[in-house]
């Protein structure tokens, strides 16, 4: 969802023609209700004021966040115009004042420090170099002590999980970008980017493989 080259980003289900059915597919196949609500709970537990969603897709997280905390200040950024159009319509229908920006992180977002950055089902779709770039940019944009919350495919730790991941995610998004996630690369990438307090908070076994939630913080020493 978030690549430097606008012509090269991966649409939500791997193909632009599938974007209209993205919400239904994710709800059916990924236990979305469980992990999205866990993301919302984690965001709100920190009492955050400014929330940025990298690769905000069709806006499902924004709507859930609004329902749980109507005054939360949410901005989503995504390069996919079709997905952003759906997100804006969904937010307007729910009454949410969420802001959605068509563009690439971090260039499309004002440079003010952010309390919490969240990203879900994005990093597995981009190259290893792009995963590193996104995480480095997230660290740079966070306030010292600010948190990054990720929900994405991680280590596929059983034969069944690997089979499901290959049959679904990799059949749509390809192997080159997704395999590092399946090999469990995310914690080491977070450490390499400079995050501290890295924690695997939860994981969900789904029909598409194992999805993890990771929490990490920008060190307070970054204020110096």
Predicted features along the sequence, with ranges:
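C-terminal lobe and adjacent flexible extensions of AdoMet/dcAdoMet transferase-like proteins
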Residues: 213-224
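A short SAM/SAH-binding and catalytic strip from SAM-dependent methyltransferases
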Residues: 116-129
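A short glycine-rich, Lys/Arg-flanked "PGG" loop and its adjoining helix->strand segment in the class I
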Residues: 132-144
